[in-house]
Amino acid sequence: MAVQQNRKTRSKRGMRRSHDALTGATLSVDSTSGETHRRHHVTADGYYKGKKVIGA
């Protein structure tokens, strides 16, 4: 079994955890409708990069 040989310090624990923070999704504003959407995703209206790609 994996059992530590020496206790890890608070500093080492913090350094390891420094990369664990979650970040929110990056958002963009559509140039056509002004709607906020996730980057590289189609808006709810069906626009992507200012062009209608879903629906008529």
From Swiss-Prot:
GO biological process, one term: translation
SUPFAM superfamilies: Zn-binding ribosomal proteins
InterPro entries xrefs: Ribosomal_bL32, Ribosomal_bL32_bact, Ribosomal_zn-bd
Keyword Ribosomal protein: yes
Region (Disordered): 1-44
UniProtKB keywords: Ribonucleoprotein, Ribosomal protein
Compositionally biased region (Basic residues): 7-16
NCBIfam families xref list: rpmF_bact (TIGR01031)
Family: Belongs to the bacterial ribosomal protein bL32 family.
Identification of the protein by name: Large ribosomal subunit protein bL32
Source species: Alteromonas mediterranea (strain DSM 17117 / CIP 110805 / LMG 28347 / Deep ecotype)
